[in-house]
Amino acid sequence: MLDSPHNPGSENAAPHDVVIVGGGLAGGLIALALHRHAPDCRFMLIEAGRTLGGHHRWSWFETDIRPAARGLMAGFDLNGWDEGYDITFPSLGRTLPTAYRSLASAEFHAKLIAELPAERVMLETKAASLDAGGVTLADGTRLAAKRVIDCRPFKPSKALSGGWQVFLGQQFRCETPHGLTRPVIMD
């Protein structure tokens, strides 16, 4: 998504192969994949907030990530239930066998900060504009790049249509054991 006109002069001095704007789940995982699988790639991850991943809990079915791509999640402190999950409705419930995973943003941030080179992550740095040749930061600094990936939060656009699911993940610490062995998914 272009925020400003392309600056053709920036291509000649592109110190970055890729600049990723937005350090949420998508941006953080892209940076991690580049670090692990393209070690010569000169990338920069820019996040406006103090932490990567914000304040979220991401949960997914094991089958949501194809087997060949699951290695990207290696090393994250995941909650996981291999025996499946329970679903409940007002008058019925059942157990489904698909493994379920969950990751808190604090663990996401900790893992990325521990693994990504410090010089490749900019926290508390706001991007003022993006174009095909790089990113201009709020302080006026220009980061020239061969490629820019916009991973900032979704903004409504007439050019896009679709829907999404709203997810509320809650984690409770109980004074006494609750006896649950699987997560409960409620629709």
Where are these regions (language model features)?
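A short, compositionally biased domain-edge/stem linker segment
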Residues: M1-G9
